[in-house]
């Protein structure tokens, strides 16, 4: 039963990040040359997506930089059409690659994942605003329900070996399930704050500042609970005063919070746990759904 639920969840997420869909409407009224270049960029991005990745030395910046640049160029005028499309393709294909990797690792039920993909595409075409939250929940569900089982299962190990040989000679290190729950609760706290900010703050979109904050370095020596507290104070101040300055501060502290969480996971178990890379990809991919949609 869990196998079917997990497969359906992955199919739902996969259908939501079909590559290039949001860009093809830009091809209307474009020259033939621009359309050819667009398809060429799409094909090149698809090939570059599946490059070799070392999960034992995971760096969130490698995933952040593509989508950060895509957000930045989205604000440019239509004269930079090809640049915009290229970054959009890279960002969407990267998200799709993350989900496809999860589907390779998990023991998926093909028919359930197929129907999940179809339903997600129908919802996307119907332009239902609130179903994005449902997609985010489904993305988190398999990791919560089957983490320990998957790490211990032989099929999980075989899928990982077939996809990329990332096992160390002395065998894998298993992260304690309580550590996963702690990280998950911290991530959900930050994500709930993002939703509250999107609902109640006067400035609904501050992705530029948010992702500049996510490119957080060791210059900021702060605890996660301090960043959460500062974010809550900025959220309350922004709701009361309705001033955009507090919205910018809110996004800044949230960005630092996400970055601190990623850095903490990577530093603590990044070189030992075979599942850390996918856990970080899960968190980051979920944050993208919440922030962008």
UniProtKB/Swiss-Prot annotation:
Transmembrane segments: 4-24, 30-50, 71-91, 103-123, 133-153, 180-200, 220-240, 245-265, 273-293
Membrane-related topology note: Multi-pass membrane protein
GO cellular component terms, semicolon-separated: membrane
Record's subcellular location: Membrane
Keywords: Membrane, Transmembrane, Transmembrane helix
Protein name, UniProt field: Protein U26
Lineage: Viruses, Duplodnaviria, Heunggongvirae, Peploviricota, Herviviricetes
